[in-house]
Amino acid sequence: MIQHESRLKVADNSGARELLVIKILGGSKRKTGNIGDIVVAAVKQATPGGVVKKGDVVKAVIVRTKSGARREDGSYIKFDENAAVVINADKSPRGTRIFGPVARELREHDFMKIVSLAPEVL
């Protein structure tokens, strides 16, 4: 569960390293987000020479959460960290590489480009 003010690691090479969640999109009083949800976030740490700079406000999709997500068969998928991928307005990633595994739930939310770039889909 990701909420307002949560810090997320960035799982791509867009230049951002850490994000601070400003808003979870999808409803006026939405409190929490899970895997596959889009958030508006501020870049808190960035690598020099990247596409995204520190202080930029970006949209990102959550790809890993510590709290995990429940699957149809009753199992849960959990990760060691909370991570997101910076995206454009057309839901395509701003970076060209994805680091670490991503959840299969992204396929249901039409993030096929992220799923195809990821080294492992769990």
Swiss-Prot record:
One of its GO terms (molecular function) is structural constituent of ribosome. It comes from the Bacteria. Disulfide bonds: none annotated. It holds the Pfam family Ribosomal_L14. GO terms for cellular component: cytosolic large ribosomal subunit. Keywords: Ribonucleoprotein, Ribosomal protein, RNA-binding, rRNA-binding. PROSITE patterns: RIBOSOMAL_L14. InterPro entries: Ribosomal_uL14 (IPR000218), Ribosomal_uL14_bac-type (IPR005745), Ribosomal_uL14_CS (IPR019972), Ribosomal_uL14_sf (IPR036853). One of its GO terms (biological process) is translation. Part of the 50S ribosomal subunit. Forms a cluster with proteins L3 and L19. In the 70S ribosome, L14 and L19 interact and together make contacts with the 16S rRNA in bridges B5 and B8. Binds to 23S rRNA. Forms part of two intersubunit bridges in the 70S ribosome. Belongs to the universal ribosomal protein uL14 family. This is Large ribosomal subunit protein uL14. It comes from Lactobacillus gasseri (strain ATCC 33323 / DSM 20243 / BCRC 14619 / CIP 102991 / JCM 1131 / KCTC 3163 / NCIMB 11718 / NCTC 13722 / AM63).
